[in-house]
Amino acid sequence: MPEGDTVWNTARVLERALVGSRLTGSDFRVPSLATTDLTGWTVSGSASRGKHLLLRLDAPAGTGESRWTLHSHLRMDGTWRAYAPGERWTARPAHLIRVVLRAPAATAVGYHLHDVALVPTAEEERLIGQLGPDLLGVDWDPAEAVRRLAAHPDTPVGVALLDQRNLAGVGAP
C-alpha cells in the first residue's frame, strides 16, 4: 500500500518528467474524463497531500480556461510511472492504465488510479480540505497535528495516527 512518502516521491518523479512541459497528448480511461483532451496544456506543478497526488495544469491561452488540477488517489494499488519517449510501458498490465499524459520528453502513465478528477485549482480544497497536516508538506505544522490528536483523547493512539483528518500521509486512506 502506498504511504505518504511513496506519494511524495511519485510527485517528485512526475515533477521531473512533466513540469514545464506542454502536453502533446492525453488519454483518460475513466468514464468521467473519457472525452477530456489536455493537448496543449502546460504542467505547472506536481504535489502530494497525504495520499492524494495533484498535477497542476495551465490551459492554453485563449481557451477561456485557467488553472486546473488533475487529482488522483493511489489507495492500495495505484501507481504513476514516467517513461522516456518510445520506452515500453512495463509497470503493470495495460488494462489497469487509467491516465496517460504525453509530453515531449516523457510520458506519464497512471495505473489503477482511484478518484481521478479534473477540477479548477481554486476548488481542489473540496477534495483534500478534510486532511490534517502533511508530514512531508511544505506547510507541515506539528502544533496543529498535536492539537488535532489531542482533541479526541479517548481514541487509541494507533487509530488516531491513521486518521487522515489528524495527520495526512500515515496509514490508511
Enumerate the language-model features and the residues they cover.
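Structured catalytic/nucleic-acid-binding cores of DNA maintenance enzymes
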Residues: 1-173
